[in-house]
Design a protein with these regions (language model features):
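Structural microenvironment flanking redox-active thiols in thiol-disulfide oxidoreductases
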Residues: 59-97, 111-115
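A short beta-strand-turn-helix
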Residues: 21-42, 65
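Conserved redox-active cysteine motifs that mediate thiol-disulfide chemistry
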Residues: 46-60
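Short, internal strand/loop/helix patches
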Residues: 93-126
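Loop/turn elements at helix/coil->beta-strand transitions in domains of secreted/extracellular proteins
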Residues: 37-42, 71-74, 99-102
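Thiol-/selenol-based redox modules, centered on thioredoxin-like
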Residues: 126-161
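Short pre-active-site segment immediately N-terminal to redox-active cysteine/selenocysteine motifs
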Residues: 40-42, 47-50, 125
Length: 161
């Protein structure tokens, strides 16, 4: 319970990465962050510093989530970078890229176990994104790069349901 309270605190308040320590998370913690039945809509994006499509879509995600902040939309970027990248290389990359949002590093190595926790069809490829609106029951998983236009369309759908 204490762990969940800490996790919710991390997710609830946008942590500015410029001086942030990036928390380690288990996939169960990630799932719990959006399974709490709250009236907040969560966008969880799985990415890595070495994944060009991942890095390319993140600025648009950040801008769109800011646009819908009043509707309680929150973004969590979950890095799937290798352990050698944690935390220094990830933090430096995030700072250089101006990714001012919630960031965590997935402290898991077995994709056969953690991928189905998000979606049974997830092969482990990135970028991958799940959008969950606890208030409406909307839940949709994407295993591909999304344009800003596609992403905003999905955010609008999730808010309207």
């Amino acid at each position: 319970m204490k762990r969940l309270a800490i996790l919710i605190t991390v997710i609830s308040f946008a942590t500015v990465v410029n001086s942030q320590s990036i928390p380690k998370m288990k996939m169960a913690d990630v799932v719990n962050s959006f399974s709490n039945g709250s009236d907040t809509m969560y966008v969880v994006n799985f990415w890595a510093t070495f994944c060009k499509p991942c890095v390319g879509e993140i600025p648009g995600f950040i801008d769109i989530v800011k646009k819908y902040k009043a509707q309680k939309v929150k973004l969590l970027l979950v890095s799937l970078d290798l352990p050698d990248y944690y935390p220094a290389k990830i933090a430096a990359f995030v700072k250089k890229s101006h990714f001012n949002t919630n960031i965590a590093w997935l402290n898991e190595t077995n994709a056969d176990i953690f991928c189905p926790m998000i979606d049974k069809k997830w092969s482990g490829a990135i970028p991958a994104t799940i959008i969950v609106n606890g208030k409406t029951g909307y839940k949709k998983f994407f295993e591909n790069e999304m344009t800003s236009e596609q992403f905003e369309k999905e955010v609008k759908l999730a808010l309207a349901k």
